[in-house]
Swiss-Prot record:
It catalyses: 2 D-alanine + ATP = D-alanyl-D-alanine + ADP + phosphate + H(+). It holds the Pfam family Dala_Dala_lig_C. It is found in: Cytoplasm. Keywords: ATP-binding, Cell shape, Cell wall biogenesis/degradation, Cytoplasm, Ligase, Magnesium, Manganese, Metal-binding, Nucleotide-binding, Peptidoglycan synthesis. ATP binds at residues 172-227. The gene is ddl. Binds 2 magnesium or manganese ions per subunit. This is D-alanine--D-alanine ligase. Mg(2+) 1 binds at residues 302, 315. NCBIfam families: D_ala_D_alaTIGR, PRK01966.1-4.
Length: 380
């Protein structure tokens, strides 16, 4: 009987964002859900200061050892003068068939790690460099959505150069009395503030500029319902059932504290009961957003639904969480795809996209050279 070769998966997690520990919990769940008869899994923890630990060292942290201690031991083994020292352990993983990154936020969702995988010529789960970078930047995301006629909230972009031109009175005239202030390139609700007066506006803008040199000021939606959808696929993606997040009435929005410090007052409705018409509209908007941004593999799309039932696309998450309370896998579970099957499908999509992109030519081919062109086969 022929023995089937296992697929070697590199599970990369951690990172330098505020979601470092969340990423570790996501990685634990993904690892536990993987069929070990089908996959060999190597673990790679990216420390907070940007050093990739070896599989053996990552497993020690996985098993509960202190990350800083293990990282110090690992870094001592590598020539610090080598500019590639931080990713040395990845360079030793020559037989990896596919990478599964689950680094949330900075470095993981902004196109950085995807560019590294491209240089390594390795398949990877999730969207490519461009789609990741555009989706991580809230301003660029909104520009794409607006160009495609996909409803999103009105906003103004502040930079160090134009910041002085947008005092609170100017913002009021454009967006109303109540606004949200957000760093353009941040996740986890870090640096986000709601402002309803001059001082709140000044304080919120000052804090947001600590995290990015581009800050969004957005109109608020009165009493919104926060709804989410999971998308899975490449050229022909499918959408999950919808879910909703309920935060305590005393809280202004689903903020960093709700997510990571004290989530005791937060509840999730999966699936959420909405009208058929609204459900269809949100689902269609999700698929349109996915296509407009050129997303691949997976994404979770967040919406704000106004009191009168009008949905607005909020944010797009290209590497959503896989923790016990994360909605991305929960929504698929409610739709009929269990955790293990979801992981299998994501890996299959990564391999499919890699081979699809590998058919493209990157060097000049003369028009009379039909040898290369004849090998092209349109993707089904």
């Amino acid at each position: 009987m022929e023995t089937k070769t296992k697929l070697h998966v590199g599970l990369l997690f951690g990172g330098n964002s505020s979601e470092h520990d969340v990423s570790k919990r996501s990685a634990h769940n993904i690892y536990d859900a993987m069929d070990k008869d089908r996959y060999n899994v190597s673990l790679f923890l990216l420390t907070r200061d940007g050093f990739v630990l070896s599989d053996a060292a990552s497993r020690r942290v996985f098993d509960g050892e202190d990350e800083a201690t293990v990282a110090a031991e690992e870094q001592a083994k590598v020539d610090a003068s080598n500019p590639l020292a931080p990713i040395w352990n990845l360079s030793q993983a020559k037989d990896i068939d596919v990478f599964f990154p689950i680094i949330h936020g900075n470095l993981g969702e902004d196109g950085t790690i995807q560019g590294l995988f491209r240089l390594l010529k390795k398949p990877f789960v999730g969207s490519g460099v461009l789609a990741s970078a555009v989706s991580f930047d809230k301003d660029m995301t909104k520009q794409v959505l607006t160009a495609h006629g996909i409803r999103n909230t009105k906003y103004v972009v502040l930079t160090p150069d134009n910041r002085a031109d947008f005092d609170y009175a100017t913002i009021q005239s454009r967006l109303g009395d109540n606004v949200f202030i957000k760093p353009a390139n941040q996740g986890s609700s870090v640096g986000i503030h709601k402002a309803s007066n001059v001082q709140e506006y000044l304080d919120g803008v000052a804090d947001a500029f600590r995290y990015d040199y581009k800050v969004l000021v957005e109109q608020t939606i009165d009493g919104p319902q926060e709804v989410e959808i999971s998308i899975l696929g490449n050229e022909q993606p499918q959408a999950s059932k919808l879910g909703a997040i309920r935060v305590p009435e005393s809280d202004v929005f689903y903020d960093y504290n709700n997510k990571f410090v004290d989530a005791s007052g937060v509840t999730f409705e999966v699936p959420v009961k909405l009208s058929d018409e609204l459900t269809q509209e949100i689902t269609q908007m999700g698929l349109q957003t996915y296509a407009a941004l050129g997303l691949k593999g997976m994404a979770r799309i967040d919406y704000l639904v106004s009191k009168d039932g009008v949905p607005y696309v909020g944010e797009v998450n290209t590497l959503p969480g896989f923790t016990n309370i994360s909605l991305y896998p929960q929504l698929w579970q409610a739709t009929g795809i269990n955790y293990a099957d979801l992981i299998d499908r994501l890996i299959e999509l990564a391999l499919s996209e890699f081979h699809y992109q590998d058919e493209l030519a990157y060097d000049f081919i003369p028009l009379d050279d039909h040898s290369a062109a004849s090998t092209y086969k349109p993707k089904a």
